[in-house]
């Protein structure tokens, strides 16, 4: 592996905001960022074109995973895009676009080996197929939003499956365009909320 440090963060955002980032869907989430400067080994400063009130939320997800600079420089962007390396407790062992990704436990993970030996994520976009796979035991879990609310009863009524609801740190929010259009008027935004 290589260090997860400020240089890696800068490299990640230089890449995301540069030519390679233009090829993917995540760049649009970070258009407020002008550039990133390294302060020390574990600190960076983000310089913005304009305020972005949800930037911290975006940095916690939305494709802001920090990438390994040396690995990408050695193998190239195209290779990395189908053979990714990260900081998690699993390693990608196989990836078939629009089908599945297979992961195996990384015994030398800095946080210790995970409790599972392997995990396979299958990309099933058709709800009835996902439910059939769940009820037959070919998949262990199906996550929202794959399953419409109307199918919950059939899952609960099946002897091999159950619906489990868990609290999550999800935040529902309205984001207004404050630059143009009707929501540029503060009174309109206040009336809505």
Language-model segment annotations:
Residues 3-4, 10, 25-70:
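Surface-exposed binding/hinge segments that line
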Residues 5-13, 29, 55, 106, ...:
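Stable alpha-helical elements in mature extracytoplasmic
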Residues 9, 14, 41-42, 49-53, ...:
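Solvent-exposed coil/turn segments that connect beta secondary-structure elements
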Residues 35-36, 93-104, 120-180, 187:
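Extracellular/periplasmic solute-recognition and catalytic clefts
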């Amino acid at each position: 592996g290589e260090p997860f440090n400020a240089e890696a963060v800068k490299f990640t955002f230089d890449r995301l905001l540069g030519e390679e980032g233009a090829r993917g869907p995540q760049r649009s989430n970070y258009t407020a960022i002008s550039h990133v400067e390294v302060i020390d080994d574990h600190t960076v400063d983000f310089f913005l074109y304009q305020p972005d009130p949800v930037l911290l939320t975006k940095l916690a997800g939305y494709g802001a995973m920090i990438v390994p600079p040396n690995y990408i420089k050695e193998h190239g962007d195209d290779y990395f895009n189908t053979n990714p390396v990260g900081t998690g407790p699993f390693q990608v062992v196989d990836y078939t676009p629009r089908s599945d990704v297979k992961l195996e436990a990384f015994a030398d993970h800095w946080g210790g080996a995970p409790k599972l030996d392997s995990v396979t994520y299958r990309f099933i976009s058709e709800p009835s197929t996902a439910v059939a796979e769940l009820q037959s035991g070919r998949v262990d879990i199906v996550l929202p939003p794959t399953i419409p609310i109307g199918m919950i009863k059939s899952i609960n009524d099946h002897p091999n499956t159950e619906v489990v609801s868990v609290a999550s740190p999800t935040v529902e929010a309205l984001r207004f365009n404050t630059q143009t259009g009707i929501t540029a008027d503060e009174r309109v935004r206040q009336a809505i909320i």
